[in-house]
Design a protein with these regions (language model features):
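A helix-coil-helix interface module used to build multimeric assemblies
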Residues: 1-128, 145
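Internal glycine-rich alpha/beta core junctions
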Residues: 20-38, 100-208
């Protein structure tokens, strides 16, 4: 209940502290007494930070996957309606070969499929629990790391405690996956600008 109250009030109401973790602990103690200090048992800010990053990043990656799949479905639906709609294919901004709207749209659907795979791959490595690593060498408390991971929705553990506390490669991998997705979407957007200038498509005012 104390944590729910803190979330409802917003982090702007937290008391001063060395960092957000200490501030939250102080806020909990203010609400439930000294027993609130036990929430830090068997944990360090090192594995807490690592867990929070992974927990939040997992949400962002899953939202990205969902949005990318929805975009692919839209492209596939429009493509299905235009399998025989002829359009020019461009090279160097010049009409070069005839193709179909379906052929063109499916090229981006294929690229988005690879983008989705990259996000799934990244999520597999993101969604590992570092908790139990403590500062970097574990904790003397006999905790069940696998149970903690299960309760927080992680698929498994970062097995090595030093790696668990210090690893940030999953951030680079996820950033690269989103950057690649952005390149795909940028290409589609640029194409639509070119096609709208040539009069082949008309963009809604909300996007123009």
């Amino acid at each position: 209940d104390a944590l729910d109250d803190i979330e409802d009030e917003g982090h702007g109401t937290l008391p001063d502290g060395e960092d957000v973790h200490a501030a939250i602990e102080t806020a909990v103690i203010e609400r439930v007494g000294e027993r609130g200090g036990r929430m830090h048992t068997a944990r360090s800010r090192n594995d807490e930070v690592a867990a929070c990053i992974r927990y939040r990043l997992r949400e962002d990656v899953l939202e990205g996957i969902e949005a990318t799949i929805e975009a692919r479905e839209v492209l596939a639906d429009v493509a299905e309606a235009h399998t025989e709609t002829i359009m020019p294919g461009f090279t160097h901004l010049q009409p070069a070969q005839p193709t179909t709207v379906a052929h063109y749209l499916c090229s981006y659907a294929s690229a988005l499929a690879r983008d989705t795979e990259r996000l799934f791959d990244a999520c597999e490595r993101v969604n590992r629990s570092p908790l139990g690593a403590a500062a970097f060498a574990g904790t003397p408390f006999d905790i069940d790391r696998e149970r903690t991971a299960e309760l927080l929705g992680f698929d498994g553990l970062v097995e090595n405690s030093m790696d668990a506390a210090s690893a940030r490669d999953f951030l680079v991998e996820t950033t690269a996956a989103f950057a690649t997705l952005s390149t795909t979407l940028s290409g589609l957007a640029e194409d639509l600008v070119v096609y709208s200038n040539a009069g082949y498509v008309e963009l809604d005012d909300a996007y123009a």
